[in-house]
């Protein structure tokens, strides 16, 4: 028998949490998005999960693991600590040594290249969902560029891993909007710095810089 989408997501997450009892907050979030994508949910499965954890699905499941919502029955990671400036989560029911936390941090560092890929893929998923709700349909995708079309408007979109990595050479045209999407961060300083140094220039070039809050599953206009 084929496993349901919910069962697949649960399986993926249980395996992850069994292997990483101490896990970086960002890694758990990105992998949750990835597992929802891999489950390839049908329309009815998607509606069922949205009733259970809210819309969008990945942030709702993530919140459940954090212990704020019992809707998705997964092992809780309801305590946290800072390691190397990063938030790591673990269960309050078990005691861990300094060596355990050091090992978790080393595992995280070795996973960074993969996590960058997962972050981009998750941002693309979120952007497609956001644009669809705004009445846009995807037309083409490739070379790091996504194109969308609505009844009387077109848009090009580019996804970046951070505000600091934005390519400033893009430009909007009279016929086509240009959207640069970046994730929100635990630190606001890079956004303040960008706004002071590049905000006026970005506005002159017609760029729309959007910020995705992946924990809430929202996208907001920045510049």
Segments predicted by a language model, with ranges:
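Short, well-ordered alpha-helical scaffold segments within catalytic/effector domains
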Residues: 124, 163-164
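Charged, structured surface patches that assemble and position nucleic-acid processing machinery
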Residues: 130, 137-142, 160-163, 169-223
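Extended, charged alpha-helical interaction scaffolds
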Residues: 147-152, 156-161
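Acidic-basic catalytic patches of nuclease active cores, encompassing PD-(D/E)XK
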Residues: 2-151
């Amino acid at each position: 028998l084929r496993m349901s989408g919910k069962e697949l997501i649960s399986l993926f997450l249980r395996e992850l949490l069994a292997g990483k009892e101490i896990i970086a907050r960002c890694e758990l979030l990105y992998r949750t998005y990835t597992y929802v994508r891999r489950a390839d949910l049908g329309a009815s499965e998607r509606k069922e999960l949205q009733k259970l954890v809210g819309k969008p699905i990945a942030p709702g499941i993530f919140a459940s693991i954090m212990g704020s919502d019992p809707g998705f029955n997964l092992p809780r990671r309801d305590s946290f600590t800072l390691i190397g400036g990063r938030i790591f989560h673990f269960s309050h029911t078990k005691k861990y040594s300094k060596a355990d936390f050091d090992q978790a941090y080393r595992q995280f560092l070795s996973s960074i290249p993969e996590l960058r890929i997962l972050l981009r893929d998750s941002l693309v998923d979120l952007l497609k969902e956001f644009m669809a709700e705004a009445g846009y349909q995807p037309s083409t995708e490739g070379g790091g560029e996504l194109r969308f079309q609505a009844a009387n408007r077109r848009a090009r979109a580019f996804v970046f891993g951070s505000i600091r990595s934005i390519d400033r050479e893009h430009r909007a045209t009279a016929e086509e909007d240009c959207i640069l999407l970046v994730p929100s961060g635990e630190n606001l300083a890079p956004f303040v710095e960008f706004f002071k140094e590049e905000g006026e220039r970005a506005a002159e070039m017609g760029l729309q810089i959007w910020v995705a809050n992946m924990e809430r599953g929202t996208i907001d206009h920045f510049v």
